Regions:
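Conserved glycosyltransferase catalytic-site signature
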Residues: 8, 78, 96-97
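Acidic catalytic patch
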Residues: 60-89
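Short, well-structured N-terminal submotif of metal-dependent ribonuclease cores
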Residues: 1-37, 51-63, 116
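A generic structural signal for short hydrophobic patches within well-formed alpha-helices
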Residues: 11, 42-45, 117-118
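Acidic, PIN/NYN-like endoribonuclease modules and their adjacent C-terminal/linker elements
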Residues: 1-3, 68, 100-127
């Protein structure tokens, strides 16, 4: 089984059980791959909690998904991730840059509904 990276909103939707938000391809990829997240997702979840876009803590979300579906944090060297992110000049969003860069280090698929990522990262998938 290969590994697929999950964008932050995918992690939130999985935690909330919002499977109706997923495309058929997204559901298939989730069910047939190991699921990985960039550690920066943890920080983005904290930001979302602070601005009250979500109500659960990052640890609650990630621990629940780790236990329920085997979601795991990527352990790639952060220096390598940042150097890769420096090449992604199509976005000013640091979270999108780092999440995409983490996936790009190994040309891994990134599951996202983000239109900018889908337009610029060849391995981004949604539908």
């Amino acid at each position: 089984m290969s590994s697929i990276y999950l964008d932050t909103h995918i992690v939130v939707w999985l935690y909330c059980g919002l499977t109706e938000k997923f495309s058929s391809l997204a559901k298939s990829l989730i069910n047939s791959n190991d699921l990985t997240f960039s550690p920066i997702v943890r920080l983005e979840l904290k930001y979302l909690l602070e601005i009250e876009r979500i109500t659960a803590s990052p640890e609650a979300i990630l621990t629940t998904l780790e236990n329920n579906i085997g979601l795991c944090s990527c352990t790639k060297n952060f220096d390598q991730v940042v150097y890769q992110a420096l090449t992604l000049d199509w976005t000013r969003d640091p979270f999108d840059r780092l999440i995409t860069a983490q996936s790009a280090l190994t040309d891994s698929l990134l599951l996202t509904k983000d239109q900018k990522i889908l337009a610029h990262y060849d391995y981004a998938r949604w539908s």
